[in-house]
UniProtKB/Swiss-Prot annotation:
GO terms for cellular component: extracellular space. The lineage of its organism: Eukaryota, Metazoa, Chordata, Craniata, Vertebrata. It is found in: Secreted. It comes from the Eukaryota. Gene3D superfamilies: 3.30.60.30. This is Serine protease inhibitor Kazal-type 7. Disulfide bonds join 32-67, 45-64, 53-85. One of its GO terms (biological process) is negative regulation of cytokine production involved in inflammatory response. It comes from Mus musculus.
């Protein structure tokens, strides 16, 4: 129970302290190759809030979560830019 509480506190602190907005970089990409060794339903994404925008115009919590959707959609969803959509 203490572990869960600690993780929730860490997530909340990360969310609140994410004060800098990331600018978009048109040439930036996301490399999902490291996640291909896991089943799509079991990709171990970290609990950090560094938002990225997918080509479906959904803001994902971080690049790992976007990669999960990219792999789930067989590449139909792509990385658009860093930051919120």
């Amino acid at each position: 129970m203490k572990l869960v509480g600690g993780l929730l506190l860490l997530f909340a602190a990360t969310y609140v302290c994410n004060c800098s907005e990331v600018t978009s970089h048109p040439s930036a990409t996301v490399d999902c190759d490291i996640y291909k060794k896991y089943p799509v339903v079991a990709i171990p994404c970290p609990i950090v809030n560094i938002p990225v925008c997918g080509s479906d115009y959904i803001t994902y919590g971080n690049k790992c979560k976007l990669c999960t959707e990219i792999l789930r959609s067989n590449g139909k969803i792509q990385f658009l830019h860093e930051g919120h959509c």
